[in-house]
């Protein structure tokens, strides 16, 4: 889709944005650094501390730090927010299946974000056997302790900022058993044993196997990282809600109409399952 936007001071305004639900997108479990404050969403998108809100069909993205290159900022946020994906076409395609149509109609404005790889990897390792409020608390503590302060906020730490952090120091952030996995992930990233660019060039099957060489990264965490930061849209993360959905809604398997875009469809299925299926 073509990018349509205007600039207003430190704010980029994406125009003609239809069917975008910020609340469900930021609260559906794919990201952990966004909070709703004063009727706006505030958090980090990569290096940019932002406030985001909607006014009718216009999306306002205000950067809370000075922007040196507005074209770069606008392009980054357009992709980060998934505005470059044709959801009108995808939802029409998915709706060829009646169950998918019902799931889409329940929450049509959910989007998949395109997040930074390193942050996504570490936050989903932290998400193992965890709940969202606790994940956010640990991730925020990690940013405050090791990240760069930008205004009144803290960016997620880079690999180099974590190079000397020990397992014991991660434990102090209440990571528990995940501390050794975070340590291993940072080590493998810094050494080049796991390389983001190489990962993104692989097909889905090879990429999943490649990233699972990191300790503590099983199929679910791998699929979340591949979907939310590597544009592997065929990735289909499975948790208890998705497994219930597969059993109750798709006993004969997923429909052909979502093939190749299973990860996008997964977000509609996941949200519908959480609020409509029996436990």
Tell me what each language-model feature is:
Residues 1-279:
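HhH-family (HhH-GPD) DNA N-glycosylase catalytic core used in base-excision repair
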């Amino acid at each position: 889709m073509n990018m349509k936007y205007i600039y207003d001071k430190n704010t980029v305004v994406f125009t003609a944005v239809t069917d975008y639900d910020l609340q469900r997108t930021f609260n559906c479990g794919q990201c952990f650094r966004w909070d709703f404050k004063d009727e706006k969403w505030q958090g980090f998108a990569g290096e940019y501390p932002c406030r985001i809100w909607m006014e009718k069909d216009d999306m306002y993205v205000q950067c809370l730090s000075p922007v040196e290159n507005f074209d770069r900022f606008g392009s980054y946020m357009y992709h980060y927010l998934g505005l470059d994906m044709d959801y009108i076409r995808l939802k029409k395609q998915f709706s060829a299946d009646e169950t998918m149509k019902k799931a889409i109609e329940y929450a049509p404005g959910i989007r998949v974000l395109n997040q930074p790889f390193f942050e996504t990897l570490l936050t989903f390792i932290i998400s193992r056997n965890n709940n969202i409020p606790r994940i956010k608390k640990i991730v925020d503590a990690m940013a405050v302790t090791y990240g760069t302060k930008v205004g009144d906020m803290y960016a997620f730490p880079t690999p180099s900022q974590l190079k000397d952090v020990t397992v014991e120091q991660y434990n102090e952030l209440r990571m528990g058993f995940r501390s050794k996995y975070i340590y291993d992930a940072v080590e493998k990233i810094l050494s080049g044993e796991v390389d983001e660019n190489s990962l993104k060039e692989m097909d889905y099957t090879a990429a999943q196997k490649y990233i699972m060489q990191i300790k503590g990264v099983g199929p679910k965490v791998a699929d979340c990282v591949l979907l939310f930061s590597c544009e592997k849209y065929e990735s289909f993360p499975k948790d208890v809600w998705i497994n219930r959905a597969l059993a109750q809604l798709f006993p004969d398997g997923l429909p052909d109409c979502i093939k190749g875009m299973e990860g996008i469809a997964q977000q509609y299925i996941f949200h519908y399952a959480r609020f409509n299926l029996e436990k």
